[in-house]
A protein has these predicted regions:
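N-terminal alpha-helical membrane-insertion module
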Residues: 1-20
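Long, hydrophobic alpha-helical segments that serve as membrane-spanning/inserting helices
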Residues: 21-87, 91, 102-168
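Heme-based O2/NO sensor domains and their adjacent alpha-helical segments
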Residues: 99
Length: 168
């Protein structure tokens, strides 16, 4: 009888507040990722940074874990269709954030930023506008392929330092 009552009450309980929180977290995640991408682009342009972008990435990773927990709580407490969507979304964004975090270790190895870093920085800044919930990345892939082709046409590095900088 108790389980039946719990199931019936769960069917009528309004989880709209939790759902709205998740949607708000999604927008916050998109905004923060856009900011982080722009800061990373500025870092590659060797601009003076007021804040440490790497510390900000680490701090936001912690926040992402809170969002994932909220998504699991929503899934565990509802019978609504597609509650796993929010979990998948936040886990995808966390994976993207971890890629940015790992990029830090690679960028730190570069002694002198090659000119290609500016091209990459511009592409990263371009990509920031496309960090939205629904995006089909066809245009971004085409642009990346164009950049890749342009880089293949460039002159080969002359010094070891230049070679290592480009390789990273």
């Amino acid at each position: 009888i108790g389980i039946t009552n719990a199931i019936v009450l769960n069917l009528f309980y309004d989880y709209e507040g939790q759902k709205q929180d998740l949607i708000r977290y999604m927008r916050e995640t998109e905004d923060e990722l856009q900011i982080l991408l722009c800061e990373l682009a500025a870092y590659l342009h060797n601009k003076d940074m007021e804040i440490n972008v790497w510390d900000r990435i680490i701090a936001f990773e912690g926040r992402m874990h809170e969002f994932i927990k909220a998504a699991y709580d929503y899934q565990d407490n509802t019978f609504h269709s597609h509650p796993g969507y929010y979990i998948d979304y936040f886990e995808m964004r966390l994976a993207q954030l971890q890629v940015l975090h790992n990029l830090h270790y690679e960028i730190k190895k570069i002694r002198k930023m090659p000119k290609q870093a500016l091209v990459i920085a511009d592409y990263i800044k371009y990509m920031a506008d496309y960090v939205v919930e629904m995006n089909i990345p066809d245009q971004q892939i085409v642009k990346l392929e164009e950049i890749s082709e342009q880089m293949k046409q460039e002159e080969l590095p002359k010094t070891r330092e230049e070679f290592e900088g480009r390789a990273l």
